Amino acid sequence: MFTGIVEETGTVKQIRRGAASAVLTVAADRVLTDVALGDSIAVNGVCLTVTEFSRNEFSADVMHETLDRSSLGALKAGSTVNLERAMKADGRFGGHIVSGHIDGTGTVSDIRKDDNAVWYRIRASGSILRYIVEKGSIAIDGISLTVAALDGDSFSVSVIPHTAANTTLSSKKKGDTVNLENDIIGKYVERLMQPGAGVYGAKGHGAVSPGASGKAQSGGITESFLIENGF
């Protein structure tokens, strides 16, 4: 798990492409101080597993699904990327829950300055926008940001100078593609509210939920279920 607080930016040294996958090598510093094989590092918000490393670089495999769903396939030698190590159990929770599993990509449609802040407008698909709420959280290229506005097929975030200067946002321009990960809590809530998505029944069908009487109920979380359980 990550928190969306970028530790440093790294530089892509090379990307070796196969038929349907790739090996990404990134030059870095801070995220390598205690790295071990098999550790997770988020690269532009995508959780990757370290397969090789040295004092100043690491490599990770990028699978077909990841290349299709994220912007990593567009990286090239010299590209700058956001980096974050997986959160330690006793670490500071500075952002929000970020899994590193990208929901899709968006396109930067507008950038404007507002005093010392910079507003970024991101156009996204309906499958991503459905989970976005004003003042809620979203990860853009692995950066935990607060949604400032929703408008039609887009949403906007307001970025402070420190965040822009210490991430890849400062180099973004109109038309650029960014990785997007919705707040996972919203996705779980929607899943639990679906009929048949009860407490039991991991496959999502034939599921039942226990009522206050101890008897099983089908249909997931419903109004009658909430009333029966004191809500």
Task: Describe each region flagged by the PLM.
Residues M1-F231:
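Conserved loop->alpha-helix
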